[in-house]
C-alpha cells in the first residue's frame, strides 16, 4: 500500500530562510499527502557540522522518511550512511538521504537539478571554457553537470587549493584526462578574460553569507553567469552581472529541479516541476525564475 504521510527534514547551517519546506509541502498538498518538512539547523542547535551523523541517526530513530543535506554537511555525512547511490558515490557528496528498511541511503539530486535548470535557462550558452567558483559539495555536483552537458573544459577555483585539486582529479578520472583543472583565485583575471561563462557554487550571497564572490571588475558582457544560491534569487553577483549585460541564471531552477528529484525519492510520486517553479518565484517574492 502506498503511504500518504511523510516526515522529512533538512540538515545544514543557516537554513532558516530555506524555501524547501514550502516547496515540498505545497506540492505534497496538491497531491493529497500529509507531508511535514522540518528544518534541522546546526547553528540553532549549537553544534558543528561533525554532528551530522548523530542527527541522521536521530532522524531515523524518530521515524523520518528521509532528509535533505546542505552546506556544510554534504561530504561529512557520507561516512554515516549505509550505502550510496552510484551518482552520490561518484561525486563524493550527498544532498538527499532516504531511509529504506532501517538503512540510510545517500543520493545526490544536485547534478540533475543544475543540469535541468541550465538546459532550460541558458540553452544557447557556449560551454567550451567554463570557470567554476567553489569545490565543495555543491561545486562537485555542478562540475559533474557541466561536463555531462558537454562543457569542453572546467577550471575549478576554490579558497582551499587542495580541495579544488582533488575535485579536478576526480573529474578527470570520471570524464577523461584534460576535462578539468584547478586554479587559485589570483588567476581569475586571466581565466575570466578567456572564459565563456562562470558558475558560482559557494555560500557567498546567501542570506547568512552576504557579499559577492569575486571582484566585480572581473565580470564582462561576454560572460554568462550562473548561480547556485537561490535565497535571495537575485544575489549581488547576478545583479552586477545583469547590469553589465551578461546572460544570467539564478539558483531557483536548480533548487526546484533538485527538489523534484528528492520529492520523487521520498514519496515514489511524480511532482509537477512547472508548478514548483511558479511556487519558488512566488515564495521568493519575485518572478525572477524564468524557465
From Swiss-Prot:
It comes from the Bacteria. Shikimate binds at residues 18-20, 70, 95, 110, 230. NADP(+) binds at residues 134-138, 228, 251. The keyword Transmembrane does not apply. It catalyses: shikimate + NADP(+) = 3-dehydroshikimate + NADPH + H(+). GO terms for molecular function: NADP binding; shikimate 3-dehydrogenase (NADP+) activity. GO terms for biological process: amino acid biosynthetic process; aromatic amino acid family biosynthetic process; chorismate biosynthetic process; shikimate metabolic process. The active site is at 74 (proton acceptor). It holds the Pfam family Shikimate_dh_N. It is an enzyme of class 1 (oxidoreductase). Keywords: Amino-acid biosynthesis, Aromatic amino acid biosynthesis, NADP, Oxidoreductase. Its EC number is 1.1.1.25. Homodimer. Belongs to the shikimate dehydrogenase family. PANTHER family: BIFUNCTIONAL 3-DEHYDROQUINATE DEHYDRATASE_SHIKIMATE DEHYDROGENASE, CHLOROPLASTIC, SHIKIMATE DEHYDROGENASE. This is Shikimate dehydrogenase (NADP(+)). It comes from Streptomyces avermitilis (strain ATCC 31267 / DSM 46492 / JCM 5070 / NBRC 14893 / NCIMB 12804 / NRRL 8165 / MA-4680). The gene is aroE.
Amino acid at each position: 500500500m502506498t503511504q500518504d504521510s511523510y516526515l522529512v527534514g533538512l540538515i545544514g547551517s543557516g537554513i532558516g530562510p530555506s524555501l524547501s519546506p514550502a516547496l515540498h509541502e505545497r506540492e505534497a498538498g496538491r497531491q493529497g499527502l500529509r507531508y511535514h518538512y522540518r528544518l534541522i539547523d546546526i547553528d540553532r542547535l549549537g553544534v558543528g557540522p561533525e554532528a551530522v551523523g548523530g542527527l541522521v541517526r536521530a532522524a531515523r530513530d524518530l521515524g523520518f522518511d528521509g532528509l535533505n543535506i546542505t552546506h556544510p554537511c554534504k561530504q561529512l555525512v557520507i561516512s554515516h550512511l549505509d550505502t550510496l547511490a552510484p551518482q552520490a558515490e561518484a561525486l563524493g557528496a550527498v544532498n538527499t538521504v532516504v531511509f529504506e528498511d532501517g538503512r540510510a541511503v545517500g543520493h545526490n539530486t544536485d547534478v540533475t537539478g543544475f543540469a535541468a535548470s541550465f538546459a532550460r535557462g541558458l540553452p544557447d550558452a557556449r560551454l567550451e571554457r567554463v570557470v567554476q567558483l567553489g569545490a565543495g559539495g555543491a561545486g562537485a555536483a555542478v562540475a559533474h553537470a557541466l561536463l555531462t552537458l558537454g562543457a569542453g573544459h572546467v577550471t575549478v577555483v576554490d579558497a582551499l587549493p587542495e580541495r579544488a585539486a582533488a575535485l579536478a582529479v576526480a573529474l578527470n578520472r570520471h570524464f577523461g584526462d584534460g576535462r578539468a583543472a584547478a586554479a587559485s583565485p589570483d588567476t581569475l583575471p586571466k581565466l575570466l578574460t578567456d572564459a565563456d561563462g562562470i558558475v558560482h557554487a559557494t555560500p557567498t550571497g546567501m542570506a547568512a553569507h552576504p557579499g559577492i564572490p569575486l571582484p566585480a571588475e572581473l565580470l564582462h558582457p561576454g560572460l554568462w553567469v550562473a548561480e547556485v544560491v537561490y535565497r535571495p534569487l537575485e544575489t549581488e553577483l547576478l545583479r552586477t552581472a545583469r547590469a553589465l549585460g551578461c546572460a544570467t541564471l539564478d539558483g531557483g531552477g536548480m533548487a526546484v529541479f533538485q527538489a523534484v528529484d528528492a520529492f520523487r525519492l521520498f514519496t515514489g510520486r511524480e511532482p509537477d516541476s512547472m508548478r514548483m517553479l511558479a511556487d519558488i518565484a512566488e515564495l521568493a517574492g519575485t518572478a525572477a525564475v524564468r524557465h
